[in-house]
Amino acid sequence: MTQTRKPFIVGIGGTQRPGSSSELALRYCLAAAEKAGAEIDLICGAELELPLFDPGVTHRTPAALRLLQSLRRADGIIIATPSYHGGMSGTIKNAIDYTEDMRGDVRSYFDGRAVGCIVCAAGDQALGATLIGLRSIVHALRGWPTPYAATIKSNEKPFVDGKPARREVAQPLEIVASQVVSFAEMAMASRVDDVAPRLVASN
């Protein structure tokens, strides 16, 4: 039995400022995933302006419900964050914290999902520290960080008119997209094989 639907890839990232480097990086990466055969969903900007996560509060805003609905459906995830003082942005971390609502799911948190990581920052130290932290969070949520991650120097004008200004900006994002889609397809095929009927030879 073979899987027929496209892998569904969710992108989370950016800042409250439209056209930020992390948002543009995420948009380009998702577009590359779509070209690779995926169905995509972008959650960024105002859609990430969620109430501070409180596990004791059961009410969820429409934006939070949309985030959770997409993540539950996702076969792969791409997260793009700026680096603020050596770590990921509070906005992105708060959105990720909402996955606690997925704790009791059959595929809890990010379980069984490939997760691509993108970090934008002005300096190498911030890029490295934030990427390590983001990968650690993905591991804690049972996700599979892709072997390759994209780091972008936001102070070097990496985007022009919303597109990568140079090949060295575009290529890492394309690699992340390719790996997320490829791993998502493999995981989907594995799940299909697990439920496929088995033929047993009779004597």
Predicted regions and their residues:
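A general structural signal for well-ordered alpha-helical segments in protein cores
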Residues: 9, 22, 26, 64, ...
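Glycine-rich phosphate/pyrophosphate-binding loop and the adjoining helix
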Residues: 2-10, 144-203
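Short, glycine/serine-rich, charged loops/turns that create anion-binding
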Residues: 16-17, 47, 122
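N-terminal beta1-alpha1 ligand-phosphate binding loop
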Residues: 2-37
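N-terminal beta-loop-helix "entrance" segment that forms/cooperates
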Residues: 45-62, 158-162
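A generic structural motif
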Residues: 36-41, 143
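Helix-loop-strand module that forms the ligand-binding subsite of alpha/beta enzymes
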Residues: 62-141
